[in-house]
């Protein structure tokens, strides 16, 4: 070997050895009483961790790192450059967290369990228990597809996620359909990604606690045909929301439902259609059932509310006149939408409409919406 080759080989061996000299980091480590988070960042000046369990009454968009009252736990660096901290084991749930390295928001590089909520990525901490019993463990799984369909109403090709239950491909049975609508700044993948929707469906159906059903999760952003999410231009956002929402609501009935009923083995009648959604999707649920009261027999908005303007009241009266099987709405008591949900409850009561107002502690969060979906599924198509 000549001198240049020897030098090149030596550099390669040095880099190879350096890479493997980096300490092995496992994170998170869940013990009996504490969870330990760790990250290799030898050049960092400060590393902290912020988790959703620190403020369960927060909203799903999270507390920005620059907020003066954000709760974080400071991590300490050892001589190998590994930062670590331990916190008490949170209650049973699927929690999310991020590290802040010198103020920069990052994932836990040692944790492969990552969620995407339409605007950001989050590392996941799953604490098993009663709350999470339907998030894992199923042995018979349904299938999910990302499906493109034509939407003449919105003038574009659009995409939706479709869940078919275990056994769909091997039988001739027709199924009822749940149309499951996402919230603001999310997309057609978010119900499955953030709420573990298909895992909950698999578990509930396998246990015989929910009817086997097809679940359709469309993209609810009229100016976007598929994930990833693109924000509306600021100058157009406020004036376009009502117009775009109305167009999307029309497209659900005129484009999405016909596509599903032409391409999947479904029972194509009101008694076998349900609609539910969270936040913006809850508003879409209220709007589509008011505009088309003869389409859905199961009406299940979450994390949203009503109002007393005449158009809204007229829509509620139309639903009552058309008839329905189940009106079930839900909100966390710390949700900023909770006052509006109380108004909706009052309006339904005043109109003599049989309904359920399901509440629990917590805010405008995925922790609540997962539980709401898990609670709702056994009530559908009974």
Where are these regions (language model features)?
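Short beta-strand segments of immunoglobulin-like
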Residues: 25-28
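Non-catalytic cap/lid and distal C-terminal segments of serine-dependent acyl enzymes
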Residues: 30-382
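Bacterial Sec-dependent N-terminal signal peptides
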Residues: 1-23
């Amino acid at each position: 070997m000549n001198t240049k080759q020897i030098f090149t080989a030596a550099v390669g061996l040095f880099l190879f050895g350096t890479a493997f000299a980096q300490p092995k980091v496992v994170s998170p480590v869940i013990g009996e009483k504490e969870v330990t988070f760790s990250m290799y960042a030898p050049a960092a000046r400060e590393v902290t961790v912020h988790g959703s369990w620190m403020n369960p009454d927060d909203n799903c968009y999270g507390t920005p790192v620059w907020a003066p009252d954000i709760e974080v736990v400071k991590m300490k660096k050892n001589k190998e450059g590994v930062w670590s901290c331990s916190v008490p084991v949170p209650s049973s749930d699927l929690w999310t967290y991020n590290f802040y390295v010198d103020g920069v928001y990052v994932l836990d590089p040692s944790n492969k369990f990552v969620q995407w909520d339409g605007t950001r990525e989050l590392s996941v901490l799953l604490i098993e228990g009663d709350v999470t019993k339907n998030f894992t463990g199923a042995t018979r799984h349904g299938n999910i597809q990302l499906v493109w369909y034509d939407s003449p109403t919105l003038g574009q090709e659009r995409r939706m996620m479709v869940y078919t239950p275990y056994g769909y491909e091997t039988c001739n049975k027709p199924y009822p359909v749940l149309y499951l609508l996402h919230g603001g700044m999310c997309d057609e993948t978010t119900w499955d990604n953030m709420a573990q929707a298909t895992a909950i469906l698999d578990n509930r159906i396998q246990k015989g606690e929910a009817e086997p059903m097809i679940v359709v999760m469309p993209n609810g952003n009229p100016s976007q045909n598929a994930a990833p999410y693109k924000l509306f231009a600021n100058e157009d956002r406020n004036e376009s929301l009502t117009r775009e929402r109305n167009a999307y609501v029309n497209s659900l009935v005129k484009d999405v439902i016909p596509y599903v009923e032409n391409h999947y083995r479904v029972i194509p009648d009101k008694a076998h259609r349900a609609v539910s959604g969270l936040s913006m999707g809850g508003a879409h649920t209220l709007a589509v059932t008011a505009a088309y009261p003869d389409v859905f027999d199961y009406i299940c908005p979450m994390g949203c509310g009503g109002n007393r303007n005449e158009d809204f009241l007229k829509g509620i009266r139309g639903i009552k006149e058309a008839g329905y099987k189940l009106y079930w709405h839900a909100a966390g008591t710390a949700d900023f939408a909770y006052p509006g949900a109380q108004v909706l409850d009052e309006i339904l009561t005043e109109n003599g409409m049989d309904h359920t107002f399901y509440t629990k502690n917590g805010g405008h969060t995925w922790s609540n919406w997962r539980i709401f979906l898990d609670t709702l599924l056994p009530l559908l198509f009974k």
